[in-house]
Amino acid sequence: MKQILYKLFEHQYLGRDEARTILQNIAQGKYNDVQVASLITVFLMRNISVEELCGFRDALLEMRVPVDLSEFAPIDIVGTGGDGKNTFNISTAACFTVAGAGIPVVKHGNYGATSVSGASNVMEQHGVKFTSDVDQMRRSMEQCNIAYLHAPLFNPALKAVAPIRKGLAVRTFFNMLGPLVNPVLPTYQLLGVYNLPLLRLYTYTYQESKTKFAVVHSLDGYDEISLTNEFKVATCGNEKIYTPEGLGFARYQDTDLDGGQTPEDAAKIFDNIMNNTATEAQKNVVVINAAFAIQVVRPEKTIEECIALAKESLESGRALATLKKFIELNNK
């Protein structure tokens, strides 16, 4: 590791194979916590390259516990995290909204590393038992239209670095990797990122894959569509900037999206959204993220039509019914 760190300190970049080997060594416990933290710190000081990101991703996918749910052609909706905003669980709520609209979802999530509550915290608050049983996940897809994959069960490297990430409490390149290594390798993905260089990096990375995707970024730094500012959406062949007002929404304040101080606070906000009793800001932010996810799967629909489908899922109670059925099936 010493030679690797010296190389990085001299502002050199890792090759794809080199990055792959480093991640494999981390997963196998060949480096101590201080060495891993030093490596992580380098990538806090500069942007990661496409080659480095692809190499890290190669290692994680090679070591993953594979899950074949390809018959469902599902979508994952995920943010990188690490934007420092402590929002409520927007992408998780959007997942159940999309599933309620009839589109299969495989949510790949983890505990919060830089926020109060990650997707796995919300699931635990609802009594969900995490599993790597593929048959159980297939039943969940068949009966609920959604399955949840707790990342550490499927990737030893993510589990190995979890205490270090929690101790640092800042975004790391593992925030960037999490969305790229859903063990299902979903057919579709909506990914939120916290800055424009990362939006371009993910767009280049996804263009090398078979995944149909959209990468979103709010220009004031959110790793999802926040409706607090203009936002950019990048797909395989297009980039476009939208305004909240142009899509019929108000422009909200940062405080409108606050996730609370505890996992219990975050779970309460999540429940309010599912019960259609949330604030206008909370509801509409979930709707707009769900809408762009729906459009990834159904590109023939206009974004206005997708917004209507997302609203209907929440307002009709179908998103809530999906959540209740999911909890019932997955808390045993």
From Swiss-Prot:
Bound cofactor: record note: Binds 2 magnesium ions per monomer.
GO cellular component: cytosol
Entry GO MF terms: anthranilate phosphoribosyltransferase activity; magnesium ion binding
Binding site for Mg(2+) 1: S91, E224
Residues involved in Mg(2+) 2 binding: D223, E224
Keyword line: Amino-acid biosynthesis, Aromatic amino acid biosynthesis, Glycosyltransferase, Magnesium, Metal-binding, Transferase, Tryptophan biosynthesis
This protein's pathway: Amino-acid biosynthesis; L-tryptophan biosynthesis; L-tryptophan from chorismate: step 2/5
EC number: 2.4.2.18
Residues the record lists as binding anthranilate 1: G79, N110
Catalytic class of the enzyme: transferase
Catalytic activity: N-(5-phospho-beta-D-ribosyl)anthranilate + diphosphate = 5-phospho-alpha-D-ribose 1-diphosphate + anthranilate
Residues at which 5-phospho-alpha-D-ribose 1-diphosphate binds: 79, 82-83, 87, 89-92, 107-115, 119
UniProt record, GO biological process: L-tryptophan biosynthetic process
Residues the record lists as binding anthranilate 2: R165
InterPro entries from the UniProt entry: Anthranilate_Pribosyl_Tfrase, Glycosyl_Trfase_fam3, Glycosyl_Trfase_fam3_N_dom, Glycosyl_Trfase_fam3_N_dom_sf, Nuc_phospho_transferase
Listed cofactors: Mg(2+)
Subunit structure: Homodimer.
Record's function text: Catalyzes the transfer of the phosphoribosyl group of 5-phosphorylribose-1-pyrophosphate (PRPP) to anthranilate to yield N-(5'-phosphoribosyl)-anthranilate (PRA).
Family note: Belongs to the anthranilate phosphoribosyltransferase family.
Protein name: Anthranilate phosphoribosyltransferase
Species of provenance: Bacteroides thetaiotaomicron (strain ATCC 29148 / DSM 2079 / JCM 5827 / CCUG 10774 / NCTC 10582 / VPI-5482 / E50)
Gene: trpD
